[in-house]
Amino acid sequence: MKNKLLTAGLIILVLGISLASVLLQTNYALALSSRSAEVAFLSRLSGMFIVGLLFCQIVLLGSYKKIKVFFTALTLILILIHPLLTVYQTKLIYGRLDPFYPFTDMCVLCPLRDQIITLGRLAFWAYIAAIAAVVLKATPWFKENWQKVHALVYVAFFFGVAHMFLIGSDARTPLYLYFFTILTGVVIIKAVRKLRS
């Protein structure tokens, strides 16, 4: 019971700091000034929650299977919504609709901002592959290899964190920066231990 309460408290803390970081950085007069600004606010909020939820899945929910499935579903929904909000915002600003842009437009030899956006895309596809490994683990090849493929959740977390810190202003608030630097360190330690075992 004590472990469950501690885990629940840590989850509330992680997600609460994610929410507080966005709310503290938001100029509400600007955020509510246009449909595009409202969509940008929702995109920022979903991005912060995605990283918080990924941390909870990796570090806190290992032994709580039912809750982990719920968090995985919630993370997957947000991971799909986050780039779709970008599609909608692009439609509002530029008047063009390209639903495949946030999922496929990878760029290595391009301006820095586009490279940072590509990190988000790589995080998206790594997470999708990690979830697919769990879903398909009953098939012959995945029966033996699903855990190796599922380890891509760590890749998704690190690419997501890099994407968030390099492109998002919300991640630069002192409270969030210090807190999530510690959390990222915890995930690094867990990833190294997993690689050694």
Summary of predicted features, one role per range:
Residues 1-197:
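Membrane-embedded alpha-helical bundles that constitute the cytochrome b-like, heme-associated redox core
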